[in-house]
Amino acid sequence: MAAQFDAVDRAILAELARNARLPNNALAAAVGIAPSTCLTRVRALQAAGVITGFRTEVSMRAIDRPLQAMISVGLSADVRADIRDYARRFIRYPQVLDVYYLAGRDDFLVNVAVRDTDELRDFVTDYLSADPGVARTETSIVFEHLRDLRLFPDPDAGPPVF
């Protein structure tokens, strides 16, 4: 069952989603509560497993990995029993940012960041396609990644207008 949040918890989570480095005093001011109350709330959200960590977003371009791709991976039927082992194996490759375990035609969606198309090709052919348990791959290059950090969409907002 999903945790129930009051308006203050929602506001805290929304602010931290936008800026996880926000000092407690600034967070408290942003949500309109006392700093001591804010700290207690954040610690309670951590203890409940709602806040699982604070992460740094790194510019892939700045570390010479500007090209991202999403690679759909389908495993052969004879390795399905080892499907979780494949996920753990994939995530260990230095090019891999995320591994998504899927329902549907493909078993995984692997998000990679590489220097260029040569490195992408080599990764797919030398690591994924060369694995006897991998039946198929399909690679899509990411042109742009947009992210909406609203955790609790306004139910009265209706569909977006373009």
Regions found by a protein language model. Give the residues of each.
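A compositional/biophysical signature of low hydrophobicity enriched in polar/charged and small residues
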Residues: M1-F162
